[in-house]
Amino acid sequence: MAPTIPPPSVPIPAATPVTVPADSSIWDRVSNWVSEHKAVVYTIAGVSVVITTAGVVYYLRKGSEQKESGPKLSKKERRKRKQAEKGEAEKASTSKTEEAAPTQPKAAAVESADELPEIDEESVVRLSEDERKAYAAKLKELGNKAYGSKDFNKAIDLYSKAIICKPDPVYYSNRAACHNALAQWEQVVADTTAALKLDPHYVKALNRRANAYDQLSRYSDALLDFTASCIIDGFRNEQSAQAVERLLKKFAENKAKEILETKPPKLPSSTFVGNYLQSFRSKPRPEGLEDSVELSEETGLGQLQLGLKHLESKTGTGYEEGSAAFKKALDLGELGPHEALAYNLRGTFHCLMGKHEEALADLSKSIELDPAMTQSYIKRASMNLELGHPDKAEEDFNKAIEQNAEDPDIYYHRAQLHFIKGEFAEAAKDYQKSIDLDSDFIFSHIQLGVTQYKMGSIASSMATFRRCMKNFDQTPDVYNYYGELLLDQNKFQEAIEKFDTAIALEKETKPMCMNVLPLINKALALFQWKQDYAEAEQLCEKALIIDPECDIAVATMAQLLLQQGKVVEALKFFERAAELARTEGELVNALSYAEATRTQIQVQENYPELASKLQGMSGGPGMR
């Protein structure tokens, strides 16, 4: 997948398109296997095995082997068997137990429940084994008729008597169906659980219990049952597979809302913050806030000066301290002509922490105090876009142009608006306009190359990046994003060479605040090219040592572990990804992965014999 926008705008949960962060192309490649192997993620039979078509093939082949075994039948017998099999195929998914329902002895043939003796716990002990079986079968038959007539309470009574005669998983499941029709969900759970104790692989009972759990909002339990059903049934029931996907989404969305209600605001990783801040051209400090000017830290101006100094360190600690300083500066006040800048900066960090209302208020206040500060319009435009208000975003860009039509940042960020909307030709025009106004800003060149690539102009894109490498040969971002384009074309060797160059330049030019994205890109390249899990893991570990808060490094590590069948270890990283999620959308994704992985572990614990069989079918690169 082609790389997207290098310097990120701040993501905000919304139903509309959101600005894609610098590392979104990495995320695309990390999670690309999900769309290609949906059964692996959503039915969680195990990433350590091939669970897409291989799972189905296994079950279908096993069924055909069973049919072909035994003595050869006559033509008449084969025709009779074929008719019987056709009848069975028309029924809903059933367990082998139900298919092998007891035969009714002729001596017990009756037409109604009135012809049967009174059945209760005391009377049943006086019946012989054969009588109990025969009466149970007849009671089940009568229960089926009552169910078909929608006389569910009568059917429940008949199935209950059948169970007294002979505890059978089919009878429990059928009684559960009656409770299901009456929306008596707890009773459905009780009866299907009893059925599954007798036959753990009873697919119909699993599906019924899963549906009841769903109705009771016990989504994790429902997910586990539907997942087990999919695996046992060989992924032949599309409704169950869809239910798994739906439940994962429902569970994650509900859980995300709960978490966000109590989750304290927090800055994202230093990599993310740094990429966002560098999407604006650097400018010298305003007059009166230079280091040469002595200001007391007990004053608002002193705190504003201190905050700017912290930002220049380009470290996680620096960003945290800078954010605190901007807040304190406004609390202390007396900022004079720099008050608009203070609101701009505090609003920026509110935005990065996901405090969107506060951010919009601060940016609007900054504009009110200094309408000529175009950066405040740009930041508010980005937020409006991500909050689903593209008209307001366009209005802010137009207002910024009215203030200063020669500000190249306006066109760079407006190009991102076009890029997100898929208006690549318009995006390319604005990136070029940004370059024409200031050709020294590397990201305008990089993003122009990316846009050309998205438009299908591969030759133009490659030429743009070659010019970048010539004119910005000491800028690691050029090699990193060019490497992404090469990786997208499966030019693995060349891509890795570019990532290595980017890594070396990061170490050389920014030893204290290295961008870890080239490390992660190289890890993914080695994984895709050689399935070199060991080296890929080591690179991710290095990235996490440098930037422990880097969500993309965490997500990549989780996927690498999952691909190797290291499910328990992968779960820890998926849970960590949820902790690092900045927006509701990111949190829902992380929770979905975590819950899918957690369910896989439970399935393997509950059905060890099934997991063993499936692992025997493992195949494909890197799967063990």
Curated annotation (Swiss-Prot):
Segments in the Cytoplasmic topological domain: 61-624
Basic residues bias: start-end ranges: 73-83
Principal subcellular localisation of the protein: mitochondrion
Mitochondrial intermembrane topological intervals: 1-38
Amino acid composition bias (Basic and acidic residues), ranges on this chain: 84-99
Segments traversing the membrane: 39-60
Presence of the UniProt keyword Membrane in the record: yes
Family statement: Belongs to the Tom70 family.
The protein, known as: Mitochondrial import receptor subunit tom70
UniProt lineage: Eukaryota, Fungi, Dikarya, Ascomycota, Pezizomycotina
